[in-house]
């Protein structure tokens, strides 16, 4: 694939993002662009992310600089992956809400979006989160469920069995398969019927 768009939300797993981006560039895509929410930039500086991708896009006040907006970014990507996807971003996407550059780009995406949740097990098991995940799937998106592994838990400050993202090389392979399965779907959606 030539163009991979990665959306990054504010989960502690964002600290591992450079490893994922490096794997994506090495094994998956020629070009990688990243959209970061404000919460994500508070945990990982965009300047660090820029070292392992082609361009970083942020939520910020409009400027006179010509930057691609959500429609252009959505059309640019051959595959769009949200990594990590918080419960908040999953909920907004499932309910058609666009409150920032990332969520409006999700709404504008002409291809199915791949969500890689990083959510605390207590939240992940809530009925509302599972409903939102099922809504995304019904809408044609893919959700790659977290796996169980020993990981650092922020709230306890200890290493515990928890839900974590799929390892970078394996995730790159999964994304390649998803891209191949959906390749004919890439492109602009058909125009709406007249009268709408």
What are these regions (language model features)?
Residues 1-115, 120-196:
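A cross-family phosphate/adenosyl-ligand binding-site feature
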């Amino acid at each position: 694939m030539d163009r991979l768009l990665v959306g990054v939300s504010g989960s502690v797993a964002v600290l591992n993002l450079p490893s994922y981006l490096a794997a994506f560039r090495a094994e998956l895509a020629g070009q990688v662009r990243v959209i970061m929410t404000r919460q994500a930039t508070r945990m990982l500086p965009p300047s660090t992310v820029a070292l392992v991708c082609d361009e970083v896009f942020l939520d910020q006040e409009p400027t006179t600089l010509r930057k691609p907006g959500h429609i252009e970014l959505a059309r640019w990507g051959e595959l769009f992956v949200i990594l990590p996807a918080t419960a908040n971003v999953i909920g907004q996407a499932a309910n058609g809400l666009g409150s920032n550059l990332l969520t409006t780009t999700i709404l504008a995406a002409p291809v199915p979006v791949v969500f890689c949740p990083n959510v605390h097990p207590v939240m992940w098991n809530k009925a509302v989160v599972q409903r939102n995940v099922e809504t995304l799937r019904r809408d044609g998106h893919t959700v790659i469920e977290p796996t169980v592994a020993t990981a650092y838990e922020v709230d306890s400050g200890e290493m515990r069995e928890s839900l974590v993202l799929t390892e970078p090389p394996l995730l790159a392979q999964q994304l390649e398969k998803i891209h191949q399965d959906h390749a004919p779907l890439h492109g602009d959606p058909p125009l709406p019927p007249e009268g709408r």
